[in-house]
Amino acid sequence: MTNLNLPSLFVPLVGLVFPAIAMASLFLHVQKNKIV
């Protein structure tokens, strides 16, 4: 395992997982407060 592969692995992971968690938490927050 080289260190050169680490950034190219973490960038899409953070770029996809973080927005997914943000959208999911926002969705659950809206569902819990019944704002819709």
Curated annotation (Swiss-Prot):
Cellular component annotations (GO), alphabetically ordered: chloroplast thylakoid membrane; photosystem I
Keyword Nucleus: no
Name listed for the protein in its UniProt record: Photosystem I reaction center subunit VIII
Topology relative to the membrane: Single-pass membrane protein
HAMAP family assigned to the protein according to its UniProt record, in alphabetical order: PSI_PsaI
Keyword Chloroplast carried by entry: yes
Subcellular localization(s) per the UniProt record: Plastid, Chloroplast thylakoid membrane
Subcellular location, principal: plastid
Biological-process GO terms, alphabetical: photosynthesis
Function: May help in the organization of the PsaL subunit.
Coiled coil spans: none
Disulfide bridge map: none
Listed transmembrane segments: 8-28
InterPro entries: PSI_PsaI (IPR001302), PSI_PsaI_sf (IPR036357)
Alphabetized UniProt keyword annotations: Chloroplast, Membrane, Photosynthesis, Photosystem I, Plastid, Thylakoid, Transmembrane, Transmembrane helix
Stated family: Belongs to the PsaI family.
Any Pfam family: PSI_8
